[in-house]
Amino acid sequence: MHQLVLIRHGESTWNLENRFTGWTDVPLTPTGVSQALSAGRLLKAEGYMFDLACTSVLQRAIHTLWHVLDEMDCSWLPVVGDWRLNERHYGALQGLNKADMARQYGADQVLLWRRSYDTPPPALAVSDPRCERNDRRYAGVPAVPLTECLKDTVARVLPFWTQVIAPAIVSGKRVVLVAHGNSIRALVKYLDRIAEADIVGLNIPNAIPLVYELDANLSPIRHYYLGDADAAAQAAAAVAAQGQA
């Protein structure tokens, strides 16, 4: 049996302010740091060990990983950072308050933008100062997106799974992935074969380790959140409520 551990980053400043974040590189809050440290302590207490860590190129995920590994006494662990694990790009919504958008456009429209499979938000203009196309961390990216739906996020996350994560697991490595709500949703959709119409109901809470037990073909045997299951469910429900006016 193989294991894979998925962790969404700890609370960020824009999580706290209920803003669409996407590719905007915002830091963790003190609560987010505490959440990451708690995740690391929990993993250590439960006896987890890793051989490879994967994360995005956004600091809220990178720093969450650092805190997790530090608490596990394995800051030396090899880390693969890749833009393909970034959060879904929220286009022109980035920086805007979710509740304000729900009041302006309606909760149903905001839910589509946040959680549907194939409805992207309005695109960010190339001339917009928020556009990441001049950010040197993306110099090697063929086409930096101006907006994404979850379908687009799946299209970049799955090649990373195929090229990096799956071969590492098959070779016997224990992998931890620290990323974002939607890049993790993309991977979970693939692993659990969740239908496009059902993915709207999936919410990933901050900094609670999600463990997947996989068979020899990397098909899930079961998955579960470490720690208090009720607390994880409440945290996921809080994420779902962020788009309400």
Swiss-Prot record:
It holds the Pfam family His_Phos_1. GO terms for biological process: gluconeogenesis; glycolytic process. Its EC number is 5.4.2.11. The record marks 180 as: Transition state stabilizer. Gene3D superfamilies: Phosphoglycerate mutase-like. Pathway: Carbohydrate degradation; glycolysis; pyruvate from D-glyceraldehyde 3-phosphate: step 3/5. One of its GO terms (molecular function) is phosphoglycerate mutase activity. Belongs to the phosphoglycerate mutase family. BPG-dependent PGAM subfamily. Homodimer. This is 2,3-bisphosphoglycerate-dependent phosphoglycerate mutase. It comes from Verminephrobacter eiseniae (strain EF01-2).
